UniProtKB/Swiss-Prot annotation:
Cofactor: Mn(2+)
One Gene Ontology biological process: cellular response to glucose stimulus
Subcellular location as annotated: Cytoplasm
Organism: Mycobacterium tuberculosis (strain ATCC 25618 / H37Rv)
Assembly notes: Monomer.
This protein's name: Phosphoenolpyruvate carboxykinase [GTP]
Enzyme class: lyase
Any one cellular-component term (Gene Ontology): extracellular region
The UniProt record lists the keyword Acetylation: yes
InterPro entries for this protein: PEP_carboxykin_GTP_CS, PEP_carboxykinase_C, PEP_carboxykinase_GTP, PEP_carboxykinase_GTP_C, PEP_carboxykinase_GTP_N, PEP_carboxykinase_N
Knocked-out gene: effects: Cells lacking this gene are unable to grow in the absence of an external carbon source when grown with fatty acids acetate, valerate, or butyrate as the sole carbon source. This mutant also fails to replicate in mouse lungs. PEPCK depletion during the chronic phase of infection results in mycobacterial clearance.
Reactions this protein catalyses: oxaloacetate + GTP = phosphoenolpyruvate + GDP + CO2
Record text on cofactor binding: Binds 1 Mn(2+) ion per subunit.
Amino acid sequence: MTSATIPGLDTAPTNHQGLLSWVEEVAELTQPDRVVFTDGSEEEFQRLCDQLVEAGTFIRLNPEKHKNSYLALSDPSDVARVESRTYICSAKEIDAGPTNNWMDPGEMRSIMKDLYRGCMRGRTMYVVPFCMGPLGAEDPKLGVEITDSEYVVVSMRTMTRMGKAALEKMGDDGFFVKALHSVGAPLEPGQKDVAWPCSETKYITHFPETREIWSYGSGYGGNALLGKKCYSLRIASAMAHDEGWLAEHMLILKLISPENKAYYFAAAFPSACGKTNLAMLQPTIPGWRAETLGDDIAWMRFGKDGRLYAVNPEFGFFGVAPGTNWKSNPNAMRTIAAGNTVFTNVALTDDGDVWWEGLEGDPQHLIDWKGNDWYFRETETNAAHPNSRYCTPMSQCPILAPEWDDPQGVPISGILFGGRRKTTVPLVTEARDWQHGVFIGATLGSEQTAAAEGKVGNVRRDPMAMLPFLGYNVGDYFQHWINLGKHADESKLPKVFFVNWFRRGDDGRFLWPGFGENSRVLKWIVDRIEHKAGGATTPIGTVPAVEDLDLDGLDVDAADVAAALAVDADEWRQELPLIEEWLQFVGEKLPTGVKDEFDALKERLG
């Protein structure tokens, strides 16, 4: 079919010529049965959900348990981000840097155009306009995703400000990021579809200079919801580098003291290190309250007053389900319980509810994430996939901060970096200054988890928790952080801290109770910002003594807390060659500032 004969192309609700010609070009290439411009309405959402139920992609959950909620079970080959198939196709290879896969953009376009040719046959092509961050921003960051997946359309409605309002913001000639997605599963006439279409061949490709995303073959999460990691981190980090701001893999937390003073924190942790749990913290210390502004991504820029302001570009939560429960994260559970949630790859109970590992209760029988019968204490595999997800509107969160939709964002008092480390790294450390803070973030190490492909348990360096999400050279990225600090008023820069909730004793148990008790660590951080709290100067930064932490009412052995806070010079000396190996890997673009910090650390450790 030519674009003139594809139904729906002639009824576009926009006069944006750039958008229209791109939509036509993609339709001619991919050959869908029809084109639909999405409007983001409730009616459209319900219609698509009904369609997904009919197709067998969605299972409608018991409305008495989860109203207006659904479960999707993916193909077992399509369950997580595929870092091995994710590319940054900058014009020059050096600009992608050592942490990214690179291919010549011309060559990649040619390969992917061959894959896209006719790939939407038998399917509907949806045009999904969306905005990352508040629609009322001075410079709203707009995008359009073209997709042949209804699952993507309904998820994008939850995760972004999607539909008519975003399209109107574009006007007739506004700039937008082009995001093209196909599951790569064309249907021949009369061919029956599968519940979760995808392809064995997968590419998730970014063209940073032209601000484009091309994704093929996966229907899952970050590979397919292109507003999330692809735009908000990979493309946005390249934009931020060019425009003088930061796009970061960080939660945004508001902490309110008993005196009713608010402090805002941005915190970067690798996947599955408790980012969502901290974002939705329930403080255990009397008089302290927490509110959330986001659990995954922060866009930060300096305001006119010289302070660093953060906004969350997302509109929903796309959280890891296993381990989320009424004890670890009651606020996430309340958000989910409000309904309007799409679950992916969790288990289904006999009464139409969902279940996953770590959730209260021991159901005797379930349908597992692969669609098979699962029996308590008999079936040896997990009922829910370790990277199974809930996709739910942010507006349902009971502790959502009122500023969550403010285009100005919130002023950041402290930046936290953290990872999952059994040894070496203390519970909390304050960086000596901004550049030392950049070094701490740049050399962040964490034991690997299930959210990405790779060997679980290995310590991998994950700079600023951005390793899989950098849209340009990691050395240039470190330099960008250093430069922003140099150009700022030092007295207004956020203080930088490193936390590790996961340190273990010799017997393998956790030394710190974590979860809501982490508010005690945050209280010390606030007191450091206010110049009220003590701490010991160590070779790695300032670390509190046991008595510097407010442990009132906490049933924990002081020796355990001391062990969690210990700085063992021998352990750190063993860490040095691992850090050095990573810095050598960063290569020729490693900033002198980061190298200087490493040399100074070596010297302090003797």
